[in-house]
């Protein structure tokens, strides 16, 4: 099993400013791939891409617009540079390592990895026939595609819930989108979660979902989020109420309940 902190959070990868091709070559000899290079010129950007290193293009106001960079930081002034968290995440994405999303008192939420698959398969197997649970993890190829396509494009999705103390995978939770049959609400952020049966009843879902709501407001700057559940799912309905989500009228043919939360955390 993947250690709960493997590849996330504490990489301490430096961000190194370079302005010329020659300077880049000197820095590369020292740091190699174990750095993120902060570049504001096209020539060194092309060199670092050829070398296979991670880089962020610093786009100054009224400066050169670069379409070749994987990551662009739009500077508001000369002091506006990427912070350590952004630098670590650029490097982790470049190295195909999972992002640490957030921590709580007992949990870590991180991007999923292939080593999580056996746990996911067991969790979804337990829920076959449950109308509230969409079977989202049937095999290796499905999870591999999700990791490769979802996280880089959206920077959110379903994440893995891990016990901070032991590294045990408790379930999945995160943010996706309401489906097309929700009319004008289609595509709106949806809070989703699935906890393994043996781990239920200990507050894991509430703790994880509270952290996700806070992350959605603070980091993703979302204004509202929805949660769907069937009328028969008493536990999900109670959780929605505990999270402060308000029930709104169902608009689908499936007769499910829809809850909405306004994300108004103070900054």
Residue ranges and their predicted role:
Residues 40-42, 227-237:
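Conserved beta-strand-loop-alpha-helix junction that forms the acyl-donor binding cleft
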Residues 201-218, 234-242:
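Conserved acetyl-CoA-binding loop-helix of GNAT-fold acetyltransferases
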Residues 4, 32, 73-198, 214-215, ...:
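GNAT-family acyltransferases
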Residues 51-55, 241-251:
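Conserved acetyl-CoA-binding loop of GNAT-fold acetyltransferases
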Residues 63-64, 232, 255:
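Positions that flank functional sites
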Residues 59, 231, 251:
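Nucleotide-sugar donor-binding loop of glycosyltransferases
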Residues 1-102:
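Asp-based, Mg2+/Mn2+-dependent phosphohydrolase catalytic module
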């Amino acid at each position: 099993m993947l250690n709960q902190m493997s590849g996330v959070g504490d990489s301490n990868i430096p961000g190194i400013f370079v302005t010329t091709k020659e300077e880049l070559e000197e820095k590369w000899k020292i740091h190699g791939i174990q750095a993120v290079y902060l570049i504001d010129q096209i020539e060194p950007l092309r060199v670092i891409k050829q070398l296979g290193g991670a880089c962020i293009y610093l786009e100054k106001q009224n400066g050169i617009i670069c379409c070749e960079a994987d990551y662009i930081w739009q500077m508001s002034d000369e002091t506006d540079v990427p912070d350590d968290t952004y630098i670590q995440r650029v490097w982790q994405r470049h190295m195909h390592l999972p992002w640490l999303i957030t921590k709580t008192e007992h949990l870590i939420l991180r991007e999923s990895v292939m080593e999580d698959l056996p746990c996911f398969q067991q969790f979804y197997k337990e829920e076959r026939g449950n109308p509230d649970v969409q079977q989202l993890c049937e095999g290796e190829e499905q999870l591999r595609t999700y990791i490769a396509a979802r996280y880089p494009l959206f920077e959110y999705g379903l994440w893995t819930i891990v016990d901070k103390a032991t590294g045990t995978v408790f379930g999945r939770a995160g943010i996706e989108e309401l489906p097309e049959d929700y009319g004008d609400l289609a595509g709106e952020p949806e809070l989703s979660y699935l906890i393994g049966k043996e781990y239920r009843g200990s507050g894991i879902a509430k703790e994880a979902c509270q952290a996700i709501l806070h992350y959605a407001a603070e980091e993703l700057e979302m204004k509202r989020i929805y949660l769907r559940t069937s009328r028969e799912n008493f536990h999900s309905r109670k959780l929605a109420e505990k999270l402060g989500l308000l029930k709104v009228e169902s608009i689908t043919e499936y007769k499910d309940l829809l809850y909405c939360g306004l994300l108004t955390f103070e900054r």
